[in-house]
Amino acid sequence: MPFAHLKTGRFHYEVFGDKQLPAVLLIMGLGMPAAGWPRSFISMLLEKSLRVITVDNRDAGLSEHFSHLKTSISVPAAIGRTLLRLPVQAPYLLEDMALDLVQLLDELKLQRAHVVGASMGGMIGQTLASIRPSRVASLTLLCRPQATRERALENCAQFIQS
């Protein structure tokens, strides 16, 4: 299992396909390991002559868990506070997670990659595209958050109740 020892920690990743092919970086959502990407999806990308890179984000899968960074709020409560536009003290930001991926691209000696993000992985991908646009060949968002604040609040309330 390959690991990248980056400035910010140890990250597990996998590479599928020929090194010479254009790269697609798959970013999974909150707390989900890269192993959650369906093998059939990865196979489909390989059949399209693409090189596929999956990575476990911070605090997910086999990557380093940042338990030394303390927070006093649960994830559902933080989501609720964010939706209500209240301040949230987070141990790290989406920008930090995007910069982890920049370091991974550097480690793999890739100037650019097509980026596919699922759920929060899409938010990380959007952040990556906004802070390092030259590193993103294209951006595809899957399972994106709700389009309206009202719908997001309804979903958050349902999540907290269950």
What is the predicted function of each stretch?
Residues 1-2:
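Short, hydrophobic/aromatic-rich segments at coil-to-beta transitions
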Residues 6-84:
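Conserved HGGG/HGGXW glycine-rich cap/lid loop of the alpha/beta-hydrolase fold
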Residues 19, 48, 99, 108-111, ...:
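Structured loop/turn residues at beta-strand edges in well-structured enzyme cores
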Residues 32, 97, 120-123:
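Methionine-biased hydrophobic packing positions in alpha-helices, especially
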Residues 61-65, 144-155:
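A short beta-to-alpha transition loop/helix N-cap that caps and shapes the active-site region
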Residues 82-85, 91-113:
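Conserved acidic catalytic loop of the alpha/beta-hydrolase fold
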Residues 111-151:
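Conserved hydrolase catalytic core segment
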Residues 154-162:
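The alpha/beta-hydrolase serine catalytic core
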